[in-house]
Amino acid sequence: MTETKTLKNFIGGQWVASTSGKEEIVPNPATGEVLAKVPISSREELDAAVAAAKEAFREWRKVPVPRRARILFRYQQLLVEHWEELARLVTLENGKVYEDAYGEVQRGIECVEFAAGIPTLMMGQQLPDIATGIESGMYRYPLGVVAGITPFNFPMMVPCWMFPLAIACGNTFVLKPSERTPLLANRLAELFTEAGLPAGVLNIVHGAHEVVNGILEHKDIKAVSFVGSQPVAEYVYKTAAAYGKRVQALAGAKNHSIVMPDADLDMAVTNIINAAFGSAGERCMACSVVVAVGDIADELVERLKKAADRIQIGNGLDQGVFLGPVIRESHKERTIKYIEIGEREGALLVRDGRRDAATSGKGYFVGPTIFDHVKPGMTIWTDEIFAPVLSVVRARDLDEAIEIANRSEFANGACIYTDSAKAIRQFREEIDAGMLGVNVAVPAPMAFFPFSGYKNSFYGDLHANGRDGVEFYTRKKMVTARH
């Protein structure tokens, strides 16, 4: 029997075995097969990574911006060359189907492409005549050592939101990837090194709470980016801010899709099925609530059930599979408890994902689950379940639909299905969410726009990606000169 390998940390350009003596297994969620072991590193190992990043910053900050951009361009090329390998790795450790994983790799590559445009993005501003013989200008500079804490559900895309842009801006980076999906992070570091990134500019420390708290409290880390659940995001924001750090913490969601009576139901059903059950519902832009407006509700629910019945469940590497497993057995059990709560609180269980054949075999499978006649305030409406569970709420009109969506504590995304320009305008103006979709499945923006949730979906001032990302990873100097 082949011995399961234990992953290493990446510190100062070297792969370093952890000395903590603690580790966890990394199973394939579709089969339970152990892929690797991941170290649960110590605070001392984090300190070593920060020290390496701090030392590397002394020279990296001086590297001309066009030269940094060329390294990013080479990195982008390597990611494209290894696209299929990276997608397969995402499926193996995360469980999402290969098609979803392939798309995730594309989004990660797009983030690197955006970061490679750093010469334009880093430009400052200048006014030559603020007074007679006096000019003034604003210049951007890197912060220093910055850190990222990333989740299991997008092991390629979310790290690529963070470290390529931060490094392009002249910072050095310490990444703490999810201990559930650590394999992809290490591969990203290998390819960045191959692209010519100097030692110490990117460091990876695997771990859990001790490493997270070390990042939040470390005096030499100037900024922290986080993506994860709402309670942890709030903790990260409050703790890091208390230590004087710049923070962006992207949190949970409960995204509503409003279906109007004039909607194209074929398109709406296809999009909702993709948004609700794609990636097993484990994404912060998943559609978890449908608000059916008027007399369209019965037909919509019937069509959603029929479409869900046709979904093939299984290993994400198998041909034709649409729905893979959730990330862990504990998450499967948590999802089943939410289904039980929904029944107990009086929602109508239209499709029970617990009964799908795949749920009784190996792997952590839950089939597509649909509730109808869900009321705002029910637990399955309120909580982020983060699984293939869809709630249908009924509303009399658009006013009530928007009021229902706006009652959620979260404000990541929302969609509307309609051809009415009036309804679209009202939705755009009145809905309380950061990323809006009109007749689209998932309104997640591309890398050159900010990922802009708010309320309890976001803690901080500057969002990930786009100009917000550049602002987050740089500081400004104003220079006023007399000639």
Curated annotation (Swiss-Prot):
Primary enzyme class: oxidoreductase
GO BP annotation list: inositol catabolic process; thymine catabolic process; valine catabolic process
Keywords: NAD, Oxidoreductase
Active site: 284
Pathway: Polyol metabolism; myo-inositol degradation into acetyl-CoA; acetyl-CoA from myo-inositol: step 7/7
Intrachain disulfide bonds: none
Gene3D superfamilies in UniProt: Aldehyde Dehydrogenase, Chain A, domain 1, Aldehyde Dehydrogenase, Chain A, domain 2
Binding site for NAD(+): 152, 176, 179-180, 229, 384
Highest taxon, organism lineage: Bacteria
A Pfam family the protein falls into: Aldedh
Reaction equations catalysed: 3-oxopropanoate + NAD(+) + CoA + H2O = hydrogencarbonate + acetyl-CoA + NADH + H(+); 2-methyl-3-oxopropanoate + NAD(+) + CoA + H2O = propanoyl-CoA + hydrogencarbonate + NADH + H(+)
Protein EC: 1.2.1.27
GO molecular function ontology, one term from the record: malonate-semialdehyde dehydrogenase (acetylating) activity
Family stated for the protein in its record: Belongs to the aldehyde dehydrogenase family. IolA subfamily.
Subunit details: Homotetramer.
Alphabetical list of PANTHER family matching this protein: MALONATE-SEMIALDEHYDE DEHYDROGENASE (PTHR43866:SF4)
Functional note: Catalyzes the oxidation of malonate semialdehyde (MSA) and methylmalonate semialdehyde (MMSA) into acetyl-CoA and propanoyl-CoA, respectively. Is involved in a myo-inositol catabolic pathway. Bicarbonate, and not CO2, is the end-product of the enzymatic reaction.
Protein name stated in the entry: Malonate-semialdehyde dehydrogenase 2
Organism listed in the record: Geobacillus thermodenitrificans (strain NG80-2)
Organism placement in taxonomy: Bacteria, Bacillati, Bacillota, Bacilli, Bacillales
